[in-house]
Regions:
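N-terminal pre-domain/capping segments
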Residues: 2-157, 175, 192, 222, ...
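Acidic/histidine-rich catalytic cores of soluble enzymes
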Residues: 62, 92-93, 181-282
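Residues at the N-termini of beta-strands
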Residues: 92, 162, 257, 290-291
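Structured beta->alpha junctions
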Residues: 99-100, 169, 202-204, 239, ...
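A short helix->loop->beta-strand "cap" motif at the edges of active sites that frequently abuts
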Residues: 120, 196, 286-290
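Active-site groove signature of glycoside hydrolases
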Residues: 155-174, 196-203
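Active-site cleft segment of glycoside hydrolase catalytic domains centered on the general acid/base Glu
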Residues: 170-184
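Short acidic/histidine-rich active-site segments
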Residues: 293-297
Length: 318
């Protein structure tokens, strides 16, 4: 989360058109495996990824115009992996859906080719959905399910083992575990067929409260629906004690990805910091073996900020 949240802009922007077909399907099978099986690396640098979100001011894409700074050099998402490898020496990336210049098959093929040619891999695709899983209108819930399935197909095409699905709000309706679980049960079943993990993140502190997420995951009861613990998001509205309990609950249900950050800028430019060493300790105690994606949201420019997160992560994974 940031001072001006991406949700507010993306809700008013046109949704990237999802192509009717996808290319290069490599995951999944004729029958869904009972649970995901990924061979996670153990070397610290190989467990790290870089998210495209902190670099939004550089990225050229139709749905990123609100964040693009024309005074800065532009970058297509196809080149993001090469930048990460060259600048940070890391080989895993996490491209946000709004940073895709297109979702047509030809562009997806170019994105995957450019990323892999640079020696990088896509390990998660965060998706900011516009319709709510818990909307009281069944038609809107159906739209959220359909959009999720399309992005699972896209992740499959790109060779990404997972997506992060945003739980969008619904007018004045409070988050509802039963309706959310009903929607996500369908999505998790589809994700299993494609061998793609669907993750839920404690991002929006109203619609994505960490304990609400845990309740939903437990109600769905599908191993392809997992938690994505973000180190600092809950600190925007809560204290360190709450964050510790939230991380403990989330990491029990995490599988393949977590967002590492040490601070976040909130309303009025106020900087919230988090005990990130405690977060790493909680992850280790939970037996978490997945990736940590660097998502710089502190003050200053993202290159130095991301390097700071990398250095902090290396010290904690040593």
């Amino acid at each position: 989360m940031i001072n001006v949240r991406r949700r507010d802009f993306l809700k008013g922007s046109a949704t990237v058109a999802v192509g009717s077909a996808v290319v290069g399907w490599t995951g999944g099978g004729l029958a869904a495996a009972p649970e995901p099986h990924m061979e996670f690396p153990t070397e610290p640098r190989e467990r790290m990824a870089v998210a495209s979100w902190p670099f939004r001011m550089f990225i050229d894409a139709p749905t990123n115009k609100w964040a693009r700074d024309p005074k800065l050099p532009g970058m297509d998402l196809k080149d993001f992996g090469a930048m990460v490898v060259k600048t940070f020496g890391l080989h895993n990336i996490e491209p946000l859906d709004a940073h895709f210049a297109s979702t047509e098959p030809a562009y997806l093929a170019e994105l995957r080719e450019g990323t892999e040619k640079a020696g990088a891999h896509i390990i998660d695709v965060p998706v900011d959905l516009h319709d709510s899983f818990y909307d009281t209108d069944p038609a809107r819930r159906a739209k959220s399910v359909a959009a999720s399935k399309k992005w699972i197909d896209i992740a499959n095409t790109l060779g990404s083992p997972s997506v992060r699905l945003h739980i969008a709000g619904s007018h004045d309706t409070k988050p509802d575990v039963d309706r959310t679980a009903q929607s996500l049960r369908q999505i998790a079943q589809y994700a299993a067929e494609k061998n793609v993990v669907a993750n839920l993140e404690n991002d929006d502190n109203f619609t994505e409260d960490p304990f609400f997420i845990v309740d939903v995951i437990e109600k769905v009861g599908n191993s392809y629906l997992r938690a994505l613990p973000d180190f600092c998001n809950s600190m925007m509205t809560h204290d360190q004690d709450f964050n510790n309990r939230a991380m403990e609950a989330m990491f029990k249900h995490a599988y393949c990805i977590s967002h590492m950050k040490d601070s976040e800028v909130g309303e009025g430019g106020k900087v919230r910091t988090v005990d990130f060493a405690k977060c790493f300790a909680i992850a280790k105690a939970a037996g978490y073996r997945g990736y940590f994606s660097m998502e710089w949201e502190g003050k200053g420019e993202p290159y130095a900020g991301t390097q700071q997160l990398i250095d902090e992560t290396l010290r904690n994974l040593a």
